[in-house]
Amino acid sequence: MNPNQKIITIGSICLVVGLISLILQIGNIISIWISHSIQTGSQNHTGICNQNIITYKNSTWVKDTTSVILTGNSSLCPIRGWAIYSKDNSIRIGSKGDVFVIREPFISCSHLECRTFFLTQGALLNDKHSNGTVKDRSPYRALMSCPVGEAPSPYNSRFESVAWSASACHDGMGWLTIGISGPDNGAVAVLKYNGIITETIKSWRKKILRTQESECACVNGSCFTIMTDGPSDGLASYKIFKIEKGKVTKSIELNAPNSHYEECSCYPDTGKVMCVCRDNWHGSNRPWVSFDQNLDYQIGYICSGVFGDNPRPEDGTGSCGPVYVDGANGVKGFSYRYGNGVWIGRTKSHSSRHGFEMIWDPNGWTETDSKFSVRQDVVAMTDWSGYSGSFVQHPELTGLDCMRPCFWVELIRGRPKEKTIWTSASSISFCGVNSDTVDWSWPDGAELPFSIDK
């Protein structure tokens, strides 16, 4: 091949390569243009697609969080006894599982579910940080909640509020939580509605502001709670707060110079609120306060000679004022009023937190004798108990035409009565039924000490 032929051949090859490159570039440009056109077309239809997606998500959300107003206008359901509702076995499970060290558990229900609320100690059972958790008030305590009947663990629990004293309730539209924390001489109650801070209440007597350790009560969109500030062994200050969507709309201080109200157990009944409380000053029977939605109130003591506090004397002649015998100190408790009659929940022991029983005194709200017609045992005298409190299931949850009364019992284990480094509790609960029930004991059942205690 002569030089001219070589030049022509090389030139032809370059021309072909150039043409191929040009065709590829043109194809690339066309491809980009088509892709851009498709994206532009998609953007032009975004409103329709997104509208479909939003409609679907909104429909699902509404289905899961249907809002109602819990009116609280129903009367308590007629009942013959108490059926076991839940038992969490948290200390038994906590010997080998990740379970919170807690105290002061309580239950509250919305129109969709019931949850167990509790005050953690910022520690797990059988762990070094459980040491010293006998202490009531510390910066590590928090109000948390989990589905009723489940052992409270980091995996199923929801943080509610930093607190060493607390209450919570649902108005049908959202959860109200009240968490008190801070120093004894200046604690603050933080109110949250659906998890958002809405209000704070400062200690007004600077002597350990404290609240119910059980559910607040909601009526027609308003929720009501009672707080105490002042001595635990003398006259203190007691206030009722009316709260709407987390904001305090009204409050009053009780005029109760010879009464002592702590750790009240409250429930709605025919549009009003009834609270049965602890007298830690001088009463072995329980004080009560009843009020309407305007906070017009009445006060008194359960008259029955079947005494409800601990410590307490032998049953005998009661009083519609404080029964002073063995009246000092006390334990959180509850009762349910039915006209002149009353269901009284109490420890079986007169002097220690052992056992638990329900007593029906058909005239006990107004009469002072100690005659009763029903006794139902739920925790044996030989087993530990502790605090107890009321909660209700609204008709919007149960489908009944009345308010179902329920109660929970705290089963305290550990210090100061047992040889452990920790103090914690499990819980059981019962609801009133108008059918057959049974006497039995549903104890905590954990075998102590744990390995951390040895």
Curated annotation (Swiss-Prot):
Ca(2+) binds at D279, G283, D309, N329. Its EC number is 3.2.1.18. Disulfide bonds join C77-C402, C109-C114, C169-C216, C218-C223, C264-C277, C266-C275, C303-C320, C406-C431. The chain crosses the membrane at residues 7-27. Residues 1-6 are intravirion. CDD domains: Influenza_NA (cd15483). One of its GO terms (biological process) is viral budding from plasma membrane. It catalyses: Hydrolysis of alpha-(2->3)-, alpha-(2->6)-, alpha-(2->8)- glycosidic linkages of terminal sialic acid residues in oligosaccharides, glycoproteins, glycolipids, colominic acid and synthetic substrates. Residues 36-75 are annotated as: Hypervariable stalk region. It is found in: Virion membrane; Host apical cell membrane. Its main location: virion. It comes from the Viruses. One of its GO terms (cellular component) is extracellular region. The keyword Cytoplasm does not apply. Residues 11-33 are annotated as: Involved in apical transport and lipid raft association. Glycans are attached at N44, N58, N73, N131, N220. Its cofactor is Ca(2+). It is an enzyme of class 3 (hydrolase). The influenza A genome consist of 8 RNA segments. Genetic variation of hemagglutinin and/or neuraminidase genes results in the emergence of new influenza strains. The mechanism of variation can be the result of point mutations or the result of genetic reassortment between segments of two different strains. Homotetramer. Belongs to the glycosyl hydrolase 34 family. Intact N-terminus is essential for virion morphogenesis. Possesses two apical sorting signals, one in the ectodomain, which is likely to be a glycan, and the other in the transmembrane domain. The transmembrane domain also plays a role in lipid raft association. This is Neuraminidase. It comes from Influenza A virus (strain A/Puerto Rico/8/1934 H1N1).
